[in-house]
Amino acid sequence: SARTLLMDINQQRWSKSLCELFEIPIDILPDIQSSTQLNIPLKPFELTLTTSVADQSAAFLACIGQHPTHASSSDRALINLGTGGFVMRSIKQPFPILTGYLQTLIYQPDHNTPQFAIEGTLNSIAAALARFPIKDCVIEDMASNDIFCIAEPSGLGAPYFRQDYGLFFSHSISTLTQQQIATLLLEAITFRIARIFEDFHRQWPVKEIYLSGGLSALPCLQQSIRQCVGIPVYYLQQKEASLQGTALLTYNTGNAFNQETMEITIQSKNERLLNKFLAWKKWLDNLLLTNI
């Protein structure tokens, strides 16, 4: 149901209106059950299914912890940068959902309150970076010009949901090198992440950020994110996070696994970067207002 989006997330049942919209008979859908203590025998395999959770939710549990209502979990945010990107943090219910952001059901404990998260998304960032020498980019080269950028080829994700702007530059880039363009794209990704973080932090303070996904290994991105958010940032080096999160939920472990983390410390302070971030926010707001 998390993938098909046919479930009414507030009622935890199939949405009649959505099923009608997509012409799906609601009576052919299976019963929605809790995520844990299922105890469904899989006789052909001589196994018992005890836990069911979506891969992204499982990875979130492995990285952040199982109990989003605990302060140690709700004060953390996860930034995953892969094919696309997302910034996610658990929320204490009832929280008003910030306009435009996604509300995600992490899991539904047996006979207990469902656990939710709020999420901002970046679309197709790997595609934007694919042909550029991003590994050669360094923090010192960021904010070295006044060109602003959007780096989401399939359109801006949450909270904007704007398909009219994808890969977009404020000025011509015809005279720039491939590495300079790559740096602009990394700036745009950093600024989108930092703005999502600002919204989350304003609603409820975030004390720690964890980075995961292939693109999060880029030193330039690690440094730029750390400098723009201004709180401790950790790079998660563990593998198979989805499998670890499923095991954590299955065995009802309250904390995340012993994480292989590396704290991102500021290696070279770029004084220009925060100023450009402030200017980028104004540019983006004006850009989106002119094309409503």
What name fits each language-model region?
Residues 1-11, 31-43:
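Short beta-strand-loop/turn "lid" adjacent to the catalytic site in phosphate-handling enzymes
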Residues 6-21, 43-212, 217-292:
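Active-site core segments that coordinate phosphate-bearing ligands/cofactors
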Residues 16-37:
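A conserved helix-loop-beta module that forms one wall/lid of the active-site cleft
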